[in-house]
């Protein structure tokens, strides 16, 4: 039996972010819809060719998406909210954009659907909306069209479908007490229709993704797998039931009773034993072993992968693949021309990971030919050399980390005592207005950074120019009447990458882009060694901004857990220790900001929830060290220094005790798309500290009206005492234009002023 290689998905953005540029050009009216569609077709053809050249046996189709693959699935199932529908009931790419971002070149602006994190990754998906009695039908046929494209090019393909149970799990019911699982019977006929269309095209295998199977699911959801995968989806192409991001051993009793033809298991994030899987799964099933890490950039230890799988060779049909979609990996290491050659030898990006699968397949298919095993050893040799590299180990960091005590994580006084001191210091009005940190990253700002890196300008010119942008941001905020200001973060390319550039233990790529959501891409830093701070990072900019105004200016830090979660971490050190190292480095930054006269310091932790293990039984351990890392970072602050934190894309009802334990003086959160429903949790738990619920959605170009914001603030005031309410957008304003920013913030400030006057009148 020949071992085959495949991946669960290929990055869709293009080597040079062609998809991002095409979409934004289309949104801005610079290219036509047909030109946009042509770009997508060219990218898909290029990606298939790259995979074929890398030696993969089967190529995925259906991994391409214009905004998000979950949103694509919604359109395929005709699950389009009424507010987003075209007048004639049809769906097209503009429908997709209205759902995802609230705006498209055609149709009217409308509230976008919610966006949240894809399991515990830094990728975002658009949350499907479900209603009572909802019907489904085959809508957008992008998948079928892409299958036809790939077949016409002569490729051996494996279409991808997001499975019906996971699709329902990932969505949200719009009515209270409505069980979205009840829609399964209405959903399955559409899946049958899709599978029939694929079978008609001669498709042998379909990858049907059911990542929800790695979770600790309620009984009803477990039982639903029998309904979906016994008879309903049979009689078409063979189904590869695909799981990722964790182990599936706890659900093997369910999986083995389903009428599928193979199982893919993530053997990187999960701890499933391949021998147990082999003994447990039906003998006629394919076992697809996800042994190449789809979520990190490190070169694989191929000899250990070979050892892990060799006993299965000849025992059953075996495929080797990526642990998950390579959506989460940069595309090609070979174009990184400035990276230290030693460090570069430690990595593998998407193209290189495909090659790793080919090398592993070659060795497994030729067990008797030792030269192929020698090739594996030669390939992985740089990983073993890394173990003694001076770029990895810092004894002083290790000593400092080992000396951490419980006292390092405790503020001097309780919040109720601190807040009185802080209110006396800052003398802010009720409903104080602020922003989350960043202001628009204009072409001029991005050009400055590019010119500095290319040597076209010197550091002095760059600093003066950044100071001018900071001055503009302060002037704009003063003119708008905001109460607590920010310096605007003109010097920052990305909230994580910027800090990584100024900390020892990180390295950076030129083109290591991955998709975050829609057209937004990020270039995560890579943690290669022990972390320390050689000198202050943000103090110079914060001090300058504060010198321009009498109003308080926030110092802006990215928290240790977020830096960890949004970087590619090292694989030879546990996450708790890495987070502690980052926290200690940023702790020193808090001290220096205070010494520079900065009285409000925001430590953003938007990734706190996404770092949660997928299995609830492992949450306590993670939350303990994650909260400790935040407190280790923040607790050094004086009592009259106000610590803020920001979290977005989060649901807090099941981690509220940990949010309270963080002991931030003020927390700002994303709530506008959920219409302030998130605040019910804060009321239920009697959240004791100040809170700023986001009053408008910065991910959409739509401008909120004063009345919209007032309505949201009134809802918030019913849940949170008004003396503890702050007024702010959902998130940073980096991706918005100045025109959008001025209009939205002006309406936000005016809304706050109106409610202040009402409150003063009611008190008089």
Curated annotation (Swiss-Prot):
Q: Which UniProt keywords apply?
A: Amino-acid biosynthesis, Metal-binding, Methionine biosynthesis, Methyltransferase, Repeat, Transferase, Zinc
Active site located where? 699
Cofactor note as given:
Binds 1 zinc ion per subunit.
UniProt binding sites for L-methionine: 436-438, 489, 604
Binding-site residues for 5-methyltetrahydropteroyltri-L-glutamate, renumbered to this chain:
17-20, 117, 520-521, 566, 610
The family line of this record is:
Belongs to the vitamin-B12 independent methionine synthase family.
Write down what this protein is called.
Answer: 5-methyltetrahydropteroyltriglutamate--homocysteine methyltransferase
Q: Where does Zn(2+) bind?
A: 646, 648, 670, 731
Q: Which GO terms describe its biological process?
A: methionine biosynthetic process; methylation
- What are its cofactors? Zn(2+)
- Could you tell me which PANTHER family the record lists for this protein? 5-METHYLTETRAHYDROPTEROYLTRIGLUTAMATE--HOMOCYSTEINE METHYLTRANSFERASE
């Amino acid at each position: 039996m020949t071992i085959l290689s495949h991946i669960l998905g290929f990055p869709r953005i293009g080597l040079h972010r062609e998809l991002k540029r095409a979409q934004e050009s289309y949104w801005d009216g610079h290219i036509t819809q047909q030109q946009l569609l042509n770009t997508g077709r060219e990218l898909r053809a290029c990606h298939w060719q790259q995979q074929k050249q890398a030696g993969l046996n089967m190529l995925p189709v259906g991994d391409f998406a214009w905004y998000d693959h979950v949103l694509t699935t919604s359109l395929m199932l005709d699950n389009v909210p009424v507010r987003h529908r075209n007048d004639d009931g049809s769906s097209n790419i503009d429908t997709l954009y209205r759902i995802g971002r609230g705006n498209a070149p055609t149709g009217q602006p409308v509230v976008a659907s919610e966006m949240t994190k894809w399991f515990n990754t830094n990728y975002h998906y658009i949350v499907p909306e479900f209603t009572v009695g909802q019907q489904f039908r085959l809508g957008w046929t992008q998948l079928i069209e892409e299958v036809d494209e790939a077949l016409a090019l002569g490729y051996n393909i494996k279409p991808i479908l997001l499975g019906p149970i996971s699709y329902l799990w990932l969505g949200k019911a719009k009515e209270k007490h409505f069980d979205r699982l009840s829609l399964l019977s209405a959903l399955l006929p559409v899946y049958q229709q899709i599978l029939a269309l694929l079978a008609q095209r001669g498709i042998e295998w379909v990858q049907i993704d059911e990542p929800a199977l790695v979770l600790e699911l309620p009984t009803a959801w477990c039982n639903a797998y029998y309904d979906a995968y016994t008879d309903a989806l049979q009689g078409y192409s063979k189904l590869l039931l695909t799981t990722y991001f964790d182990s599936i051993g706890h659900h093997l009793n369910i999986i083995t009773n389903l009428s599928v033809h193979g199982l893919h298991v993530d053997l990187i994030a999960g701890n499933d034993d391949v021998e147990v899987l082999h003994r447990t799964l039906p003998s006629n099933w394919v076992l697809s072993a996800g042994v190449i890490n789809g979520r990190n950039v490190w070169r694989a230890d191929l000899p250990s992968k070979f050892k892990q799988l060799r006993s299965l060779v000849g025992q059953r049909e075996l495929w080797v693949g990526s642990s998950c979609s390579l959506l989460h990996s940069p595309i090609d290491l070979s174009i990184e021309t400035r990276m230290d050659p030693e460090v570069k030898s430690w990595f593998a990006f998407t193209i290189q990971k495909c090659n790793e699968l080919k090398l592993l397949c070659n060795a497994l298919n030729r067990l008797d030919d030792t030269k192929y095993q020698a090739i594996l050893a030669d390939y992985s040799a740089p990983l073993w050399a890394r173990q003694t590299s001076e770029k990895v180990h810092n004894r002083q960091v290790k000593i400092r980390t080992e000396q951490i005590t419980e006292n390092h994580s405790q503020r001097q006084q309780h919040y109720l005592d601190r807040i009185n001191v802080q209110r006396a210091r800052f003398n802010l009005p009720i409903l104080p207005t602020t922003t989350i940190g960043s202001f628009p990253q204009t072409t001029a700002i991005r050009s400055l950074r590019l010119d500095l890196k290319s040597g076209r300008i010197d550091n002095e010119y760059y600093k003066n120019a950044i100071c001018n942008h900071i001055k503009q941001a302060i002037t704009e905020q003063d003119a708008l009447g905001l109460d607590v200001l920010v310096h605007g973060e003109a010097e920052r390319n990305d909230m994580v990458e910027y800090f990584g550039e100024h900390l020892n233990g990180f390295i950076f790529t030129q083109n290591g882009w991955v998709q975050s959501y829609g057209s937004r891409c990020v270039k995560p830093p890579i943690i290669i060694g022990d972390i320390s701070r050689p000198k202050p990072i943000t103090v110079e900019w914060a001090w300058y901004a504060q010198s321009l105004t009498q109003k308080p200016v926030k110092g802006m830090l990215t928290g240790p857990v977020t830096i960890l979660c949004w970087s590619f971490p090292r694989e030879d050190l546990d996450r708790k220790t890495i987070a502690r190292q980052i926290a200690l480095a940023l702790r020193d930054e808090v001290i220096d900001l205070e010494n520079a006269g900065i009285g409000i310091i925001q430590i953003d932790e938007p990734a706190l929830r996404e770092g949660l293990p997928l299995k609830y039984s492992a949450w306590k351990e993670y939350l303990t060290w994650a909260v400790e890392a935040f407190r280790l970072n923040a607790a050094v602050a004086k009592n009259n220094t106000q610590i803020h934190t920001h979290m977005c894309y989060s649901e807090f009802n099941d981690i509220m005790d940990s949010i309270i334990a963080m002991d931030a003086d003020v927390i700002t959160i994303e709530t506008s798309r959920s219409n302030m429903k998130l605040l019910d949790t804060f009321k239920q738990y009697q959240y004791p500290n100040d809170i700023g619920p986001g009053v408008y959605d910065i991910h959409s170009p739509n401008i909120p009206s004063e009345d919209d914001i007032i309505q949201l603030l009134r809802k918030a005031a019913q849940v949170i005492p008004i003396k503890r309410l702050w007024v702010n957008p959902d998130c940073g304003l980096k991706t918005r234009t100045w025109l959008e920013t001025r209009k939205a913030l002006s309406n936000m400030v005016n809304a706050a002023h109106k409610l202040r006057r009402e409150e003063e009148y009611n008190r008089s």
